[in-house]
């Protein structure tokens, strides 16, 4: 597929243009057929592009937006009062067909509320959910939901499993992704009523490859392709994982810097350490998909660096190339036709 167009919320995130513009430059250099609609305050975007010598780049088009959704703004306030925000206009561009996807590092709650209002959910889906990758011993696994819904019933968790499974089938060409339900133990007697009801629904659905309960350590074992949980638990697990990865890398760096002997050992181990850093670096897994919408929306971590935001853009490109929305919609329609979804 050529001429992919992505709308970028250029003003969102903790760092705004300082990170977004360099990341966009990296993305277009890697993708000659990629066009980016940079949404935000025109003068500021122009100045940033000029600073990086990219003002005349044909792969960039500036779309002016006079407002910015702040990171601490209430979603309801952003939805009602920020109709000319960079976030809102970027999502509108997807609805209007001028962009095939949207990427934002902005306020998660506001992004979810705005995307749901503008794009609407797919038939059979009550709530969108956030899904992203985590590194494992054997490669990677995906986790859904990572914070879109902090209180989900069994029916919603079942819908998350359907959407996550469809995403993996589309992107990784796996016909039967292994699905695990996050719980405090693998025994059937463990868990609250919500988890037990979800487990029963998944077990009764022969269409999906449900393998049972998984515990927190299964995030990294690679035993399953998709871990299903509510957004409260998923978000806590994600942030804890990112913190642990940073701690491990920091401790290793300090350990090899203690004296001349450890510095020599560090030089010898440098190739292995670089490999470890690449495997664990959270920026390499940045870019979470908002599944269940009539359009592609990718959420970048608010504090992402250039590499991280670039990965979020490339995640959007990947989803466009693989027609993720259409494939998820087809999967959901199959479930509706079989009476598995209402």
UniProtKB/Swiss-Prot annotation:
InterPro entries: FA_synthesis, Phospholipid_synth_PlsX-like. Keywords: Cytoplasm, Lipid biosynthesis, Lipid metabolism, Phospholipid biosynthesis, Phospholipid metabolism, Transferase. Pathway: Lipid metabolism; phospholipid metabolism. GO terms for molecular function: phosphate:acyl-[acyl carrier protein] acyltransferase activity. Its main location: cytoplasm. It is found in: Cytoplasm. The keyword Transferase applies. GO terms for cellular component: cytoplasm. Its EC number is 2.3.1.274. One of its GO terms (biological process) is fatty acid biosynthetic process. It is an enzyme of class 2 (transferase). It catalyses: a fatty acyl-[ACP] + phosphate = an acyl phosphate + holo-[ACP]. Pfam families: FA_synthesis (PF02504). NCBIfam families: plsX. PANTHER family: FATTY ACID/PHOSPHOLIPID SYNTHESIS PROTEIN PLSX (PTHR30100), PHOSPHATE ACYLTRANSFERASE (PTHR30100:SF1). Homodimer. Probably interacts with PlsY. Catalyzes the reversible formation of acyl-phosphate (acyl-PO(4)) from acyl-[acyl-carrier-protein] (acyl-ACP). This enzyme utilizes acyl-ACP as fatty acyl donor, but not acyl-CoA. Belongs to the PlsX family. This is Phosphate acyltransferase. It comes from Legionella pneumophila (strain Corby).
């Amino acid at each position: 597929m050529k001429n992919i167009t992505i709308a970028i919320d250029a003003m969102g995130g903790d760092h705004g243009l300082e990170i977004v513009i360099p990341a966009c430059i990296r993305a277009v250099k890697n993708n000659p057929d990629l066009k980016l609609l940079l949404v935000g305050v025109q003068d500021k975007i122009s100045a940033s592009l000029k600073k990086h010598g990219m003002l005349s780049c044909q792969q960039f088009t500036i779309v002016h937006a006079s407002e910015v959704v702040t990171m601490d703004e209430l979603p309801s306030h952003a939805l009602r009062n920020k109709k000319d925000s960079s976030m809102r206009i970027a999502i509108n561009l997807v609805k209007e067909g001028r962009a095939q996807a949207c990427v934002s590092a902005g306020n998660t709650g506001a992004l979810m509320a705005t995307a749901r209002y503008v794009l609407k959910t797919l038939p059979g889906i009550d709530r969108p959910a956030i899904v992203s990758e985590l590194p494992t011993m054997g490669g990677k696994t995906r986790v859904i939901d990572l914070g879109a819904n902090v209180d989900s019933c069994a029916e919603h968790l079942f819908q998350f499993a359907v959407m996550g499974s469809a995403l993996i089938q589309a992107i990784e060409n796996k016909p039967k992704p292994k699905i695990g339900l996050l719980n405090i133990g693998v025994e059937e007697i463990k868990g609250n009523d919500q988890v037990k009801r979800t487990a029963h629904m998944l077990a009764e659905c022969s269409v999906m490859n449900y393998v049972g309960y998984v515990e927190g350590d299964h995030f990294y074992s690679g035993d399953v392709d998709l871990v299903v949980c509510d957004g409260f638990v998923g978000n806590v697990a994600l942030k804890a994982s990112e913190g642990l990865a940073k701690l491990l890398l920091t401790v290793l760096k300090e350990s090899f810097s203690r004296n001349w002997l450890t510095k020599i050992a560090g030089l010898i181990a440098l190739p292995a350490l670089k490999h470890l850093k690449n495997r664990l670096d959270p920026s390499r897994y940045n870019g979470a998909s908002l599944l269940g919408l009539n359009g592609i929306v990718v959420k970048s971590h608010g504090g992402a660096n250039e590499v991280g935001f670039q990965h979020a853009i490339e995640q959007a490109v990947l989803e466009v190339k693989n027609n993720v929305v259409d494939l998820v919609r087809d999967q959901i329609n199959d479930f509706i036709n079989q009476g598995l979804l209402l």
